[in-house]
Amino acid sequence: MIKILFICHGNICRSTMAESVMTYLVEKEGLADKFYINSAATSREEIGNGVHHGTVAKLKKEGIPVIPHRAVQMTLNDYEEYDYLIGMDTENIRNMQRISGGDPDEKIYKLLTFAGSGLDVADPWYTGDFEATYRDVLAGCKGLLEIGRAHV
């Protein structure tokens, strides 16, 4: 089983969107039993809060079920438990490395790396552009699915 943890700053917009999109993609491909998918934050600011209404609206518009979720913070234990820890931007990656004590097992990636880009997924909390975030998340998740498919 491939274990994936999507991570963003607050765990209410981008990482929850990626969790829902990736879950949808693996279910659509009949691979749900081969993947364990979750999400977390690097900060404590939104702990306990649900998925942002903008993320919910965009996912519903795309026909993607929203995974019920309450924001949690990434821990060192998560680094040990997951195969892939996927951050949304450079700041997330830096904070993930701080939480995990570096990346000795090379498990930390930026999502758009899987779409052939080193760019950040813009945070719709600030941009208000959930459409652009969705396009990036979908591209990254599709690329990650191809990598995962080769290992299941």
Give the predicted meaning of each segment.
Residues 8, 59, 86-87, 137:
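Hydrophobic structural packing positions in well-ordered secondary structure
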Residues 1-81, 149:
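Conserved active-site segments centered on acidic
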Residues 84, 90-149:
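Phosphate-binding/catalytic loops
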